[in-house]
Amino acid sequence: MVNMKASMFLTFAGLVLLFVVCYASGSEEKEFPKEMLSSIFAVDNDFKQEERDCAGYMRECKEKLCCSGYVCSSRWKWCVLPAPWRR
């Protein structure tokens, strides 16, 4: 099961890379592949830099309040889903 997931992920990543290379080779701009790859990897950095007023799932809640739908675990100080079996 794990091997199937890994092979599907690698196949998908290969197809995306093939698309980027083919699209870049058809483009007249020589800097396009670098710009395309940097914009793809910059999206991840944008999400990391985005600050929230509340802490999401499994985020530290010592200084911030948890977002709606989550509660601060008294034992671990992480935002978790509320459950009837938790104290």
Curated annotation (Swiss-Prot):
Pro-sequence residue ranges: 25-52
GO molecular function: ion channel inhibitor activity; toxin activity
One Gene Ontology cellular component annotation held by this UniProt entry: extracellular region
Keywords of the record: Disulfide bond, Ion channel impairing toxin, Knottin, Secreted, Signal, Toxin
Annotated signal peptide: 1-24
UniProt cross-references to InterPro entries, sorted A to Z: Huwentoxin-1, Huwentoxin_CS1
Compartment(s): Secreted
A Pfam family hit: Toxin_12
Disulfide links within the chain: 54-67, 61-72, 66-79
Tissue: Expressed by the venom gland.
Transmembrane segments: none
Superkingdom to which the source organism belongs: Eukaryota
Family statement: Belongs to the neurotoxin 10 (Hwtx-1) family. 51 (Hntx-8) subfamily. Hntx-8 sub-subfamily.
Role, per record: Ion channel inhibitor.
Entry domain remark: The presence of a 'disulfide through disulfide knot' structurally defines this protein as a knottin.
Name the record gives this protein: U3-theraphotoxin-Hhn1a 8
